[in-house]
């Protein structure tokens, strides 16, 4: 059975959750953290994913890639690229398909990977984390992404999940996932005809800011409006602090960290920590050793200084709030609660700005870091055939209108707006077209000028074939089922011809008709499905050979990572065995080994140690196993004698304890019999 898995794919850190019969649980990673760094690093032998990537980030800065969610599905010529590129220390390149990729060194060779591959590497890592923690199969995943993700980006993240060996049952907007978490676990929501509770969710994470207005009733929610600033987040605060200290250190220490990627990254990491400290304290020290040119730096910052530093950023808080309210056709007075999520909302001055924008106090009833992942896990569980969850209905909304067009074959309209902006999804529409033969259809955004800069207006194209027009007929009616699926992806589910047939239908009897009245029939015309047509889709999704090639490459890299990890484990096991056996041979094992055995084994241990730190320092798994088994062949023999003697001692001790217990019991019984006898004698007297 597959365990439903929810992933909050964060720009800086990601959170994993699983749904089980007893509820929704956060999954801790290999170092017991409840979030995992969203990093992919590359080394001399293998990849460093998640925590391993973070550990090596500073020393491996050119070969470590973060900000994964920002480049998935992004064209190299997209206007956002210039903004995003400043946050990357690895080399970004243009791929053959015009997408953004990265060039790194892996196993001593220059390698180029697409953003989809990088995301797949990380998703594969967290999949493995969940499998290790839950000891269960992981097949299905629900991934939470920003509401501003385009159709192309949603397909790309779904492709990444497939490359990682997962079935993406749903790509959900992250704030919607948090709202599901709110709605499912809140017990005081209005019911029936009562006025719904209107809640504004403000999510400010590492790289973006989303405001969504939701209407809640028990067991359901509806998204009323969503707006965002996709270039406003915690990393902007971190960079503002870093730039402040870069200027200070240039003047104070005569070093320019902007010229050294490693130095800049170290100060950036320290700036993030300083930001968090100042969220709880009014002042904090700031220092780093050997930043560059063997120079140690130190300084400090107060909360007031930080607030002054980020004032230009705070002016951007209001706009998404205003736009979300306008889309929902509401005012701040209509909002019942304002829930804040995302780590950046912990900054006191930012919280004040959000509160002022709504003119309301803020609520933190949700876990700011984990609500999205838990909501995603619950949504994944809804799609599970084996796990029962409480009923909960939710609908998201189309941010932009989507139209479908088709070949003009007869005198009729050539296009139609099918999913207007603000309408809910998932949703299905059925249209009827008069067709004279095979045809094509396209989906596109109705008003491209309203899209974010760089977003492609065209969404998908379909070829619909197999249409047979009867002889003598000019055209035939074709029913086309258009759908916006739960992930917000636009598809054509079905296309088929119809025909009218005449059938006999029972005429309803009058109410006063006798019970034995004979039924009457009438002939009616019904429209029924005739022939299903073939649909070939041309979307942003990877299919066939391109997808299989990426899966094959990922599997090969995963196998290499696994081999390197297992080899390191075997090497460590050999090293530990050498030191442990040498110590025990001098102490507890000493009485159980002959002098000849001691001499031989001591020599073997010395040779193995010398080999391990020389020729065997970078050897293969099989050789470490062979060396271990060579030592164990004699070491285990001596250990067996020691264990046999220890068992003999335990048995002897157990026998003595049992004999002592029997003696004590016999003494107690004798004393009891004596007391009873004395009592009888006393009774006779």
Curated annotation (Swiss-Prot):
Region (Disordered): 651-685
Basic and acidic residues bias locations: 673-685
Subcellular location: Cytoplasm
GO annotation, cellular component aspect: cytosol; nucleus
Top-level division of the source organism's lineage: Eukaryota
Main location as per UniProt: cytoplasm
Keywords: ATP-binding, Chaperone, Cytoplasm, Nucleotide-binding, Stress response
Gene Ontology MF term list: ATP binding; ATP-dependent protein folding chaperone
Protein family according to the UniProt entry: Belongs to the heat shock protein 70 family.
Protein name as annotated: Heat shock protein homolog SSE1
Species of origin: Naumovozyma castellii
